[in-house]
Amino acid sequence: HQVATGEIVNCDVDIAGINDLYLQTVRSFYEMGGEKVFDADKIVMFFDHYAPCATITQAENHKQFRKFCFEQGIEKLMDIDQGVCHQVLADKGWVHPGEIVVVTDSHTTTHGAFGAFGTGVGATDLATIMITGKLWFMVPEIFRINLVGKLQPGVLAKDIILHIIGDLGADYGVYKAVEFAGPVVNGLSISERMCMCNMSTEMGCKTSYIQPDAVTME
């Protein structure tokens, strides 16, 4: 259904991801009365920050995560040899246009490259999703950046987004959604689009979006 800027909506979450910095998510799950996750197939655990572990505490955290996954029947445990969370989600083909992707990582905006709503949250919000399958959001203001012209040799997607952030500032997009569009964006590969969307959080954006096209579907 249609929504308006500033409206509060309670949404079903398609992918809930937790990285190994956030063992508190598991603790919060039980502190909030959680017994069984809403849908084990929609929850993904990533060991990508402490990989490999540098301390006993980090190793113990991984042990607790593995135990939780076993008890809850969560099969999507991306252990220390699987890769970085957002790249794994892309490589596995788990993100699709129109889906809501929530991960305990600020760069979850990456998944706007696939036409999905991707945003980062903290431990309590993610625990809420694990219990209910839902999370509330305030519909953000949207601004669009149209990129036209032709890139000079050696200019990459990272250069584009860093230039945009430099022009607009680190707080320009706070609780806003950015749409990247125009001929330049249309000519970018999916990896380049992921780079653009990933870095949008560095100007404060709640989420990012690129209209799905043939590149997305491929």
Language-model features and meaning:
Residues H1-E218:
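Fe-S-dependent hydro-lyases/dehydratases of central metabolism
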